[in-house]
């Protein structure tokens, strides 16, 4: 059977150890901080990036250059291996589209997948992909199985500070200033891969109660298989959420990491991303 190689970007929130252990090739996004450029997870960590956000510095994220994908695909596919390239939602970044364009410019056999998610929402798809490759499942069947898995994943983001939303033009400066004064915490979810703001919470506790209600509705009669929490330097918030979810859903295993800069650049310090995978 033809060898299958997995490629992704730097936004899955999976550990470096896991990615390396499973021979997953990462093409990182780029970050710009006060005009200086950095390679995500190479020149700067997620924790370091959040420190810059806390200082209210000008930060931006950008997709990898198309040449990065072309070089990777040509090198990885030169022995005839199939390449499965899975990336953060096309509704959040141009990374998927750039990867697809690159796949059409090389001789290698490349299948590019839009995860329609980010953080552990992408990470759980990668983990499932790893298992399917180990089982020898064909690439066409893998695409179908990931489409089905995606229906069992729900992602929410609780905005920490509104400054980044103001800078990104998602809300007006006036609304942002009022929201900051009232300590409003907008909550967003991904709708077909695009971030939609769906609720405004006033406190951490009220945001957690809202998430509990929404997740209960999402899982219905199913059990929770995995919970991933990516946070922007607010581990005490994560601990509160875990306590509520332990009691409500009997979850005792969590994947926790500092959130990808692609999220924290828009959500600010104090944000969390919650990803639930139901059985």
Curated annotation (Swiss-Prot):
Keyword Chloroplast: no
Gene3D superfamilies in the record: 3.30.1180.10, 3.40.50.10170
Signal peptide: none
Membrane is among the record's keywords: no
Domain DegV: 4-278
Residue ranges crossing the lipid bilayer per the database entry: none
Annotated binding of hexadecanoate, by residue: 61, 93
Keyword terms, alphabetized: Lipid-binding
Domain of life: Bacteria
PROSITE patterns: DEGV
GO molecular function: lipid binding
InterPro entries assigned to the protein according to its UniProt record, in alphabetical order: DegV (IPR003797), DegV_C (IPR043168), DegV_domain_contain (IPR050270)
Biological role: May bind long-chain fatty acids, such as palmitate, and may play a role in lipid transport or fatty acid metabolism.
Name of this protein: DegV domain-containing protein SAR1438
Species of the source: Staphylococcus aureus (strain MRSA252)
Lineage: Bacteria, Bacillati, Bacillota, Bacilli, Bacillales
């Amino acid at each position: 059977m033809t060898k299958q190689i997995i490629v992704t970007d730097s936004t899955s929130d999976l550990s470096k150890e896991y990615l390396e252990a499973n021979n997953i090739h990462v093409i990182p996004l780029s970050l710009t901080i006060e005009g200086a450029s950095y390679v995500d997870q190479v020149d700067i960590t997620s924790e370091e990036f959040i420190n810059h956000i806390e200082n209210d510095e000008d930060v931006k994220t950008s997709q990898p250059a198309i040449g990065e994908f072309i070089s990777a695909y040509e090198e990885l596919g030169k022995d005839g291996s199939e390449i499965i390239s899975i990336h953060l939602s096309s509704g959040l970044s141009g990374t998927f589209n750039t990867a697809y364009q690159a796949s059409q410019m090389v001789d290698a056999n490349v299948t590019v997948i839009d995860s329609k998610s980010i953080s552990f929402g992408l990470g759980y798809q990668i983990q499932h992909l790893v298992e399917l490759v180990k089982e020898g499942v064909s690439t066409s069947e893998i695409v179908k199985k990931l489409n089905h898995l995606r229906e069992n994943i729900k992602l929410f983001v609780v905005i920490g500070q509104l400054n980044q939303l103001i800078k990104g033009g998602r809300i007006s400066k006036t609304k942002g200033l009022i929201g900051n004064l009232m300590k409003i915490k907008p909550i967003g979810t991904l709708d077909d891969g695009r971030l939609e703001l769906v609720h405004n919470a006033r406190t951490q506790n009220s945001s957690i109660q809202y998430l509990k209600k929404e997740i209960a509705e999402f899982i219905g009669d199913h059990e929770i298989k995995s919970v991933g929490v990516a946070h922007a330097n607010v581990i005490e918030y994560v601990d509160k959420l875990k306590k509520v979810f332990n009691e409500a859903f009997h979850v005792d295993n969590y994947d926790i990491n500092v959130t990808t800069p692609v999220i924290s650049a828009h959500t600010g310090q104090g944000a969390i991303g919650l990803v639930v995978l139901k059985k």
